[in-house]
Amino acid sequence: MVRHFLLSVPISVLALLLNAMPLAASDCIDLQGSLMQGGLVWGRVAPGSRVTVDGSPLDVLPDGTTVAGFGRDAAASAELLVEGETPCRQTLQIQSREYNIQRVEGVPQDTVTPPPERLERIKRERQLVGSAKARYLARPDLLQDALAGFAWPAIGPISGVYGSQRIYNGTPRSPHYGVDVAMPTGTPVLAPSAGVVTLAEPDLFYSGGTIILDHGFRLSSSFLHLSKLHVEVGQEVQRGELIAEIGASGRATGAHLDWRMSWRNQRIDPQLLAPPMPEPAAPAP
């Protein structure tokens, strides 16, 4: 019998309300988004400016839009430097978060501690996923669509949240980097924003059926544990387009969608970029 136990310190309501609200201002840049661990922020500088965060250069779109993301365990502050027509330096204060502890029982043990003969496959698949996320797609139109706000790829109960420390069958494993939506196998998965498919694999060891959707400039969404894929690599999809169906493939104890997001090599929280989860539609009489 599969059992789930969730010991949680919830994300503060204030943190979620910060989504897409102005965060900070200086003489040259106003930031929007969520300036916290797992958050994504964006703003506009003079076109042609050079922007860095802690010395790492950021992409600057032709209209001056620039984006930065912060991982689960980001430091408490980061230095933003803008050089160009309107130079400035700004210290970004990054809000810390407390994360859930989630105990999951009943997972097949070979997906918790894989046998030696599985390790080569796991390594190969990690490289495949890494390559798909590392592709550089210079599409300002896709990124602008994403920054206008993501839609939920599936509507339903949230059964797992970003950042949780996962304990499988009593064994601590890596944190969970996505948000889980628990719905039956076959439930449609829709593109939360426009993008280009960079990975479409029906059976990866941990994530089962998996799609990666590139939203431009190394901002991407991943969709895990799918039962059926409706897209292929290289295909461009629009917001709301059917891309897959929910399943229980890979390391899963039941049917659900695991939606993840990455900016460069930082894993960010999709829930901070989406509106509150809508109520499921009432069944037809």
Positions of the model-derived regions?
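Bacterial N-terminal signal peptides
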Residues: 8-20
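Cationic-aromatic interfacial patches
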Residues: 24-98
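Conserved, short, structured surface segments that act as functional micro-motifs
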Residues: 209-215, 219, 235-282
